[in-house]
Amino acid sequence: MKGLIQRVRGARVEVAGEIVGAIDNGLLALVAVEPEDTPEHADKLLHKLLNYRVFSDEQGKMNRSLKDIGGGLLLVSQFTLAADTRNGMRPSFSTAAPPALGAELFDYLLQRAQGQHPDVASGRFGADMQVHLVNDGPVTFMLQI
Protein backbone atom coordinates (compact mmCIF):
# COMPACT_ATOMS: atom_id res chain seq x y z
CA MET A 1 0.00 0.00 0.00
CA LYS A 2 1.29 3.42 -0.93
CA GLY A 3 0.33 6.83 0.33
CA LEU A 4 1.63 10.01 -1.26
CA ILE A 5 1.05 12.66 1.37
CA GLN A 6 1.10 16.40 0.89
CA ARG A 7 0.90 18.99 3.64
CA VAL A 8 -1.81 21.41 2.57
CA ARG A 9 -3.38 24.70 3.63
CA GLY A 10 -6.58 23.39 2.08
CA ALA A 11 -7.75 20.78 -0.43
CA ARG A 12 -10.94 19.61 -2.08
CA VAL A 13 -12.08 16.91 -4.48
CA GLU A 14 -14.75 17.43 -7.12
CA VAL A 15 -16.66 14.87 -9.17
CA ALA A 16 -18.71 16.21 -12.09
CA GLY A 17 -18.45 19.73 -10.67
CA GLU A 18 -19.68 18.72 -7.19
CA ILE A 19 -17.40 18.98 -4.15
CA VAL A 20 -17.39 15.51 -2.57
CA GLY A 21 -14.66 16.08 0.03
CA ALA A 22 -12.77 19.05 1.46
CA ILE A 23 -10.42 19.96 4.29
CA ASP A 24 -8.65 23.05 5.56
CA ASN A 25 -5.15 22.77 7.06
CA GLY A 26 -3.94 19.15 7.08
CA LEU A 27 -2.88 16.29 4.82
CA LEU A 28 -3.98 15.20 1.38
CA ALA A 29 -3.20 11.49 0.98
CA LEU A 30 -3.29 9.87 -2.46
CA VAL A 31 -3.64 6.15 -1.76
CA ALA A 32 -2.78 3.16 -3.96
CA VAL A 33 -3.69 -0.42 -3.08
CA GLU A 34 -1.46 -3.23 -4.34
CA PRO A 35 -2.47 -6.89 -4.87
CA GLU A 36 -0.81 -8.23 -1.70
CA ASP A 37 -2.30 -5.57 0.59
CA THR A 38 -4.48 -6.51 3.57
CA PRO A 39 -6.44 -4.64 6.24
CA GLU A 40 -3.26 -4.76 8.35
CA HIS A 41 -1.46 -2.73 5.66
CA ALA A 42 -4.27 -0.18 5.75
CA ASP A 43 -4.05 0.02 9.56
CA LYS A 44 -0.30 0.64 9.37
CA LEU A 45 -0.75 3.32 6.73
CA LEU A 46 -3.44 5.03 8.80
CA HIS A 47 -1.18 5.00 11.86
CA LYS A 48 1.50 6.76 9.81
CA LEU A 49 -0.96 9.24 8.31
CA LEU A 50 -2.18 10.32 11.73
CA ASN A 51 1.20 10.30 13.50
CA TYR A 52 3.85 11.18 10.88
CA ARG A 53 5.50 14.41 12.02
CA VAL A 54 5.37 16.81 9.06
CA PHE A 55 3.98 19.94 10.74
CA SER A 56 6.20 22.59 12.30
CA ASP A 57 6.58 23.09 16.03
CA GLU A 58 7.36 26.42 17.73
CA GLN A 59 11.00 26.19 16.59
CA GLY A 60 10.04 25.58 12.96
CA LYS A 61 11.04 21.90 13.00
CA MET A 62 8.81 19.18 11.57
CA ASN A 63 7.88 17.75 14.92
CA ARG A 64 4.07 17.72 15.01
CA SER A 65 1.63 15.21 13.55
CA LEU A 66 -1.83 15.54 12.05
CA LYS A 67 -3.24 14.40 15.40
CA ASP A 68 -1.14 17.00 17.22
CA ILE A 69 -2.48 19.90 15.16
CA GLY A 70 -6.04 18.58 14.80
CA GLY A 71 -5.82 19.00 11.02
CA GLY A 72 -7.96 17.49 8.30
CA LEU A 73 -7.23 14.30 6.36
CA LEU A 74 -8.40 14.06 2.76
CA LEU A 75 -8.10 10.51 1.37
CA VAL A 76 -8.14 10.08 -2.41
CA SER A 77 -7.80 6.71 -4.14
CA GLN A 78 -5.21 6.77 -6.92
CA PHE A 79 -4.34 3.43 -8.49
CA THR A 80 -1.78 5.09 -10.80
CA LEU A 81 0.64 5.33 -7.85
CA ALA A 82 0.96 1.54 -8.02
CA ALA A 83 2.04 1.62 -11.69
CA ASP A 84 5.21 -0.10 -12.85
CA THR A 85 7.14 2.59 -14.73
CA ARG A 86 10.48 0.83 -15.04
CA ASN A 87 10.16 -0.26 -18.66
CA GLY A 88 8.94 1.36 -21.84
CA MET A 89 7.09 4.60 -22.35
CA ARG A 90 3.70 3.54 -21.04
CA PRO A 91 2.90 2.64 -17.43
CA SER A 92 1.80 -0.88 -16.57
CA PHE A 93 -0.95 -1.24 -13.99
CA SER A 94 -0.42 -4.96 -13.38
CA THR A 95 1.09 -3.99 -10.02
CA ALA A 96 -2.15 -2.29 -8.87
CA ALA A 97 -4.80 -4.22 -6.96
CA PRO A 98 -7.90 -5.34 -8.89
CA PRO A 99 -10.71 -2.77 -8.54
CA ALA A 100 -12.75 -4.90 -6.10
CA LEU A 101 -9.82 -5.29 -3.68
CA GLY A 102 -8.84 -1.65 -4.12
CA ALA A 103 -12.37 -0.49 -3.29
CA GLU A 104 -12.63 -2.84 -0.30
CA LEU A 105 -9.34 -1.75 1.27
CA PHE A 106 -9.80 1.95 0.48
CA ASP A 107 -13.24 1.84 2.12
CA TYR A 108 -11.73 0.00 5.10
CA LEU A 109 -9.04 2.70 5.41
CA LEU A 110 -11.65 5.46 5.18
CA GLN A 111 -13.92 3.87 7.81
CA ARG A 112 -11.01 3.32 10.20
CA ALA A 113 -9.80 6.90 9.67
CA GLN A 114 -13.27 8.29 10.40
CA GLY A 115 -13.36 6.26 13.60
CA GLN A 116 -9.96 7.51 14.79
CA HIS A 117 -9.82 11.16 13.66
CA PRO A 118 -12.45 13.90 13.83
CA ASP A 119 -11.82 15.56 10.45
CA VAL A 120 -11.70 13.06 7.57
CA ALA A 121 -12.97 13.55 4.02
CA SER A 122 -12.51 11.55 0.83
CA GLY A 123 -12.85 11.46 -2.88
CA ARG A 124 -15.01 8.89 -4.63
CA PHE A 125 -13.37 5.55 -5.44
CA GLY A 126 -13.10 4.90 -9.19
CA ALA A 127 -14.49 8.30 -10.19
CA ASP A 128 -12.89 10.84 -12.50
CA MET A 129 -11.91 13.41 -9.87
CA GLN A 130 -10.48 16.90 -9.92
CA VAL A 131 -8.26 17.51 -6.91
CA HIS A 132 -7.57 21.11 -5.89
CA LEU A 133 -4.98 21.88 -3.24
CA VAL A 134 -2.77 24.56 -1.80
CA ASN A 135 0.52 22.87 -0.99
CA ASP A 136 2.19 24.04 2.20
CA GLY A 137 5.97 24.11 1.89
CA PRO A 138 5.72 22.18 -0.38
CA VAL A 139 6.03 19.15 1.87
CA THR A 140 5.43 15.82 0.12
CA PHE A 141 6.36 12.28 1.19
CA MET A 142 5.80 8.81 -0.26
CA LEU A 143 4.80 6.33 2.44
CA GLN A 144 5.13 2.65 1.55
CA ILE A 145 3.72 -0.09 3.74
Curated annotation (Swiss-Prot):
The leader peptide range reads none
What reaction does this enzyme carry out catalytically? Answer: glycyl-tRNA(Ala) + H2O = tRNA(Ala) + glycine + H(+); a D-aminoacyl-tRNA + H2O = a tRNA + a D-alpha-amino acid + H(+)
Q: Which GO MF term does the entry hold, naming one?
A: Ser(Gly)-tRNA(Ala) hydrolase activity
A GO BP entry is: D-amino acid catabolic process
TM region(s), chain numbering: none
Q: Which HAMAP family match?
A: Deacylase_Dtd
Outline the subunit composition: Homodimer.
What is the protein's known function? An aminoacyl-tRNA editing enzyme that deacylates mischarged D-aminoacyl-tRNAs. Also deacylates mischarged glycyl-tRNA(Ala), protecting cells against glycine mischarging by AlaRS. Acts via tRNA-based rather than protein-based catalysis; rejects L-amino acids rather than detecting D-amino acids in the active site. By recycling D-aminoacyl-tRNA to D-amino acids and free tRNA molecules, this enzyme counteracts the toxicity associated with the formation of D-aminoacyl-tRNA entities in vivo and helps enforce protein L-homochirality.
Q: Which family does it belong to?
A: Belongs to the DTD family.
Question: Which protein, by its recorded name, is this?
Answer: D-aminoacyl-tRNA deacylase
Species for this entry: Pseudomonas entomophila (strain L48)
**Lineage of this protein's species?**
Bacteria, Pseudomonadati, Pseudomonadota, Gammaproteobacteria, Pseudomonadales
